[in-house]
Each structure stands twice: as C-alpha cells, then as structure tokens.
Amino acid sequence: MQEKATLKRYGIFLVGVLICAMGIAFLSRSALGTSPLSSVSFVLYLATDVSAGLYTFACNMLFLAVDVILTRRFGWMQWLQIPATFVFSLCIDLWLAVIPTQLNGPLSLKVLYLILGCPIMALGITLEVLANVTILPGEGIVKTLAAKGGWEFGNVKVAFDCTLTAIASIIAFLTFGRLNGVGIGTLVSALAVGQLVKLYSRCIKRSAARRAGGGAVQ
C-alpha cells in the first residue's frame, strides 16, 4: 500500500514537471519574454545552436553544485534532482518543438500564449510541490540561500529571479543589441505565477478537506 502511494507521488511529480515545462514553452514562444528562472537558458538558446533543454540542464546543475557547496551534503534529495532536471529539460525541448513561435505573429496570439503560459506553469509547480518527492535545483538553491541567510523564502525568490533576469538581459544586449527572450512576459510571469500557485494550493487543500469530511461522515 505504501509503495503504491509512493509511486502515485512520483507520478504526480512527473506530470507536474511535464505541465510546468509546457507553461514555460508557451511563455517562451509568446515572444513577450520567458519566465525569470528560464531566462538565461532561453536567451543562450536564441543566441546559439544549442537546445534550450541542454542549457536548462546545465544551469540547474550549476544551481545544484552551489547548493551542495553551501549545505555540504549530497543526499538522496540531491541525487533525485539530477534525473528530475533531465526530464524537465527534455520536456522543455519537446514542448518548444511542438508549440510554434509567435515572434512574427499577431499581438493577440502573443498575449494568448502569455495568458496560457502563466496558469499552466503554476499548475505544474503546484503538482510538483504536492507530490513532495523532490524539488528542482532552481527552487532548491533559493530554499538553501533563505535558510543560510535567515531570510524569507519569498524575498530570496524575488531577488534570485531578478538576478537571473538581469544576467539574461545583459547576455541579450551583448548578443543581439536589444532585449530578446526577456520582456513584459517575464515580468507578468514573475508576478502572476506565484499568486496562481497559492490559489491552486488553496483549492487543492479545500478539496482534500471536503473529501476527508465526506469520508468521516460515511
């Protein structure tokens, strides 16, 4: 019974990763700017012939390495982040191949992609957290920095996202002479995704409470 529950949690996590990657792909293909966490990887992808997934994997492995240095431990949670990141990176490349870019598309479709991307990405993150199996290195490093510095997770997350966006913007300016891959969509996703995750989490908790109450009555 316990093994079945564990497998279910892993399944939920994998579905969450797949959905989160889809949301990121919609944001990236909107041509309005990708998510802050994916900004460096996506700008490098636009500037070279290397896939976004490969850059995503490399960036996340860097985050994991810093996490290990700061915590001085490499347990099963860290080990799990490696295959999880691999699947996540693969899913990003998959969705980018399937979802057409709106670089030269009408503004209405760009906005539609942005509107789709934020809630889809938030749903994926919510499922990843709900599964409680492991976390991706991009979130893990923020958690570690917050714990080490005694700061609030939310504040560190904002600072981390701003830092990545700034780095991506510098790379874009040096490579293209303008912002490319970073834009209003990056700002919107930074503001919206966290709030949507909170909303989804509350809905899931209420649903679970209702089911538990119904079970108790029966």
Can you describe what each PLM-predicted range is?
Residues M1-Q218:
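Core subunits and conserved enzymes of cellular information-processing
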